[in-house]
Amino acid sequence: MPRPSLCADSGGGMMTTLTARPEAITFDPQQSAQIVVDMQNAYATPGGYLDLAGFDVSTTRPVIANIQTAVTAARAAGMLIIWFQNGWDEQYVEAGGPGSPNFHKSNALKTMRKQPQLQGKLLAKGSWDYQLVDELVPQPGDIVLPKPRYSGFFNTPLDSILRSRGIRHLVFTGIATNVCVESTLRDGFFLEHFGVVLEDATHQAGPEFAQKAALFNIETFFGWVSDVETFCDALSPTSFARIA
């Protein structure tokens, strides 16, 4: 027997129901946002930070294509599109010094310490590494936000942007599922936002089990998991219903 769908706001508007795990979730696209996390050369392109640090980025191309599809559908349905770029200033002041755990745990910073010739090239604002991949181009009306840590809510105006627009539902895509995507969704959960991940529009940093573990955590404890085709179907005109 199917579980009932969830609806956070019954105050009216054009609503749609997205089939997801562990249950369907109902939302108003015009009061929702698609969050595109860190689709930069650093994370999705050979020669970028993840590749140079020893992570496999060979299967990111389908993810890029799926994000293109999801963004197009979301924009047509009136959803706000928010793009994140992870990184720091050219001097890495924003990355933190030895007194910051980020200094010790960031694989980008560790890679540059091991390979000094890369200093200033990884995740530095203005660098090729920091730029979004060529296939994904923000459009007028989209919002592009820099972030200095894994979570898109930390030291950014994201929560204020969402609350000022009455946005409670967030649909996540991007890289890496087990790091910045999950971190941002978790923080959103603590701030009373409903988070959905489109699993085929995300990619892990590390082995495949890291992707599976992150999705398990999300659907079991923090949010919902769906896919791009189901998301696009939910945003088709025939899927909308007015809820009084």
Swiss-Prot record:
It is an enzyme of class 3 (hydrolase). It catalyses: (Z)-3-ureidoacrylate + H2O + H(+) = (Z)-3-aminoacrylate + NH4(+) + CO2; (Z)-3-ureidoacrylate + H2O = (Z)-3-aminoacrylate + carbamate + H(+); (Z)-2-methylureidoacrylate + H2O + H(+) = (Z)-2-methylaminoacrylate + NH4(+) + CO2. One of its GO terms (molecular function) is hydrolase activity, acting on carbon-nitrogen (but not peptide) bonds, in linear amides. Gene3D superfamilies: Isochorismatase-like. The active site is at residues 38, 147, 180. Keywords: Hydrolase. Its EC number is 3.5.1.110. It comes from the Bacteria. Induction: Up-regulated by the nitrogen regulatory protein C (NtrC also called GlnG) and repressed by RutR. One of its GO terms (biological process) is nitrogen utilization. Pfam families: Isochorismatase. NCBIfam families: RutB. Hydrolyzes ureidoacrylate to form aminoacrylate and carbamate. The carbamate hydrolyzes spontaneously, thereby releasing one of the nitrogen atoms of the pyrimidine ring as ammonia and one of its carbon atoms as CO2. Belongs to the isochorismatase family. RutB subfamily. This is Ureidoacrylate amidohydrolase RutB. It comes from Shigella flexneri. The gene is rutB.
